[in-house]
Amino acid sequence: MFAISKLSPLLLSLVLLTPIVRAQSLSEAQVKSLLVRVAERRASSPDVHADFQEQKTMHLLNRPIVSSGKIWFHAPNKFRREITGNSPSVTVSNGRDLWIYYPNFKSAEHYFLGKRSPVDAAIAAINTALNLENVENTFRISGAKIDNGYDLQLLPRSASMKRTFQKFDLRLNNDLVAERTEMAQPNGDHIVTTYSNQTRAAIPASTFEFAPPRGTEVTNPLGR
């Protein structure tokens, strides 16, 4: 069994979430109805593109790390996440492989998905925030209706998910797209991500493929 500590800190920071605001609580039936609406919206518009800003408070650091960039997502499990600024990175998954590329260091990490490793648990959490497909199988869900959308609190069912994060809160806007997410990890790390300029325009399939540039040092942290 792979240890979660072997994963890249950037990979672990990808899971996205939000705190619950006191509002009109949803019944179990209302939560199920909301998830049906999300599924219908996803079926008609499987693509999401947004800008994001993220703040990570890590137990080993005195100051939070703030980053921003863009994210592209195609349901059910393809995404691309580009962080800009002084420490840029590109994270791409086509549903089978995951790449994390660091252009400043000309290095890339390559992970193979579907091996029931901690990587799969982390990616499942990312997909949950942006997709919510089959979310009831993985999480116990409660929530509330707020003026501009919904706040959901997701508690992981599986041991692998519980090792990845302790708290997973998700805010959806009225278009049923992630607006803010918050995650607390068992090690004390805390990540808050906010999204803006969300669109559902079609995204080219090539967006979710990655080939490391010539001269890139490629590593496989978890092997094959």
Please describe what each predicted stretch is.
Residues 8-18:
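Bacterial N-terminal signal peptides
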